[in-house]
Amino acid sequence: MDIQAALGQRAGVGRYARELLWHLGAEAGSDEIAAFYFDFKRRGMGAPPPGVQMRACRWLPGRVTQNLWKRLGFPPYDWLAGDADLYHFPNFVRPPLSKGKKSIVTIHDVSFLRMPETTEAKNLAWLSAEIHNTARKADAILTDSYFSAREIRELLNVPEDKVFPVWLGLPKWGPPPDPEAAMAARKSLGLENPYLLMVGTIEPRKNIPFLVEIYEKFTDFDGNLVIAGGLGWKTGPTLRAIAESPRKDGIKLLKHLGDAQLAALYAGAAAFVYPTRYEGFGFPPLEAMSRGVPVISAKNSSLPEVLGDAAEWVEGFDAEEWARKIRKVLGDSDRMTRLRAAGLERAKQFTWEKTARETWEIYRRFKS
């Protein structure tokens, strides 16, 4: 299993690679799992999970190898990582392999094909070309939802029996934060009023300028709008929308949060609002549910599948309608209680143990 993404990413593909690797050991039985990564700078990955052997390439930088793969299709990945019955690449793309080597690739979503305007231009051309090559050469494709499986079959022209949807898991949270400590953490972030929360990388699919517009329409809410997430790509429209908003003083953009701060944010949120345009899975609202926060979400892409009946849904992108729906939810304590309870139950269905078990079953089908 290639775990390069786990070196530098706390969220997204990095989290997927780390969590899956950590839980696969329990499924392996007599089989051996090896995790491979480039470690030219000697950063290391720490102690391996039980049942996993770590393999690192320390004589060749990963970036150099990536350029060789892009330009020459050489050297084969297995020359560097060692022999295996099956190779799993969890980050969209299959690098070159020697003839006859079997591979599985996780393509988390195909938003860059469905909505190319939301993707960085420097990555779009290469990724769009490489993903077709990957889909053709991989023995099987994993993806995060049934929605994404349909998208992959349609946009990459892949046979139905080659694509396998496997839901992702949620981390096992510790106990809820101490109320006084959580309140102190929120105060340190300048939050003493009620607030609406959105968590996610700042990028076009998250539709944050529209979220700002919703907040502007929700004039009878005198609390804050909190957007927690690192800067991604094409952030200009989002940053301008915040800077030019007549309610800009109430908008908090929090870019670098530790786990304790994020837990405190969830604990104090009046509601989680998610007007995203496209999701291959939708971690943030599911995480909010697991923390007992009522979720108000766009009804599109994978979200109805993942969130089920536990969210308050809004169809389309009319800011007045969104403000009306949020107002209705916040003003109905019974509804808020139902959403909290339903969200907590829904979140229980998503565990990394289940993800690893289903992934291992697919490995078994293709490794021999």
Language model regions located:
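Carbohydrate transferase catalytic cores enriched for Leloir-type hexosyltransferases
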Residues: 1-368
